[in-house]
Amino acid sequence: MNLEKQLHEGLEAISGLSADVAHLSSRLLRYIELITKWNSTHNLTSVRNPESMITRHMLDSLVVLPHISGPNIVDVGSGAGLPGIPIALARPEWQVVMVESNQKKAVFMQQVVVELRLQNVSIRQERVEKIKPGNKVDTVISRAFSSLERFMRLSKHLCENNVDHCRFIAMKGAFPDMELMQLPPEFSVEQIIPVAVPGLRAKRHLVVMRCHSE
């Protein structure tokens, strides 16, 4: 199966995507090309072949869409731009802020923004605890960033302008029993949602959390 067909079929299998699959597919393939090109010298991701990137990066990022709210999204610890860039490509009406302290990864994401002409993405090369929220944030999301406790502790200020409605979503693999036990009472877990990534057998869970109003 060629890359275009693999990606197209994977996108069609995601419920609630509500995007132009052909257009989104072509943009995601260009993004994969950029990751592959930069990966040889910048070590952006341990996933090396484009076929695996489709499943483990693109589709894995997009299965969250039915479970997040816009229009203002913050992606914490974006790395090579995941999940924020696929989300921004699928939801051009949303604004996505990518937070990444690593310079080479932030520079790469900026190049992706230029190459794909992404007007709804901004890159912040800073530690998340230094970020000052501007607009009301609707969703703060992280993928392979840290433990739940650390994610919430470092990011909680991002929702201070919208504390009643803002949600934190951590993308996890297996059910994170130990991490859940370590969450302090100021944070509550609203849902733990098992998600299926097309073409991937590994377990995936979304942990939906919020801060309590003071």
Swiss-Prot record:
Record's GO cellular component, any one?
cytosol
Binding residue positions for S-adenosyl-L-methionine: 77, 82, 128-129, 143
InterPro entries linked to this entry? rRNA_ssu_MeTfrase_G, SAM-dependent_MTases_sf
Q: Which reaction does it catalyse?
A: guanosine(527) in 16S rRNA + S-adenosyl-L-methionine = N(7)-methylguanosine(527) in 16S rRNA + S-adenosyl-L-homocysteine
The protein's GO terms of the molecular function aspect are: rRNA (guanine-N7-)-methyltransferase activity
Tell me which domain of life the UniProt entry assigns to the organism this sequence originates from.
Answer: Bacteria
What EC number(s) is this enzyme filed under? 2.1.1.170
Q: One Pfam annotation, family name?
A: GidB
- Asked if rRNA processing is a keyword of the record, the answer is yes
Protein name listed in UniProt: Ribosomal RNA small subunit methyltransferase G
Q: Which gene encodes it?
A: rsmG
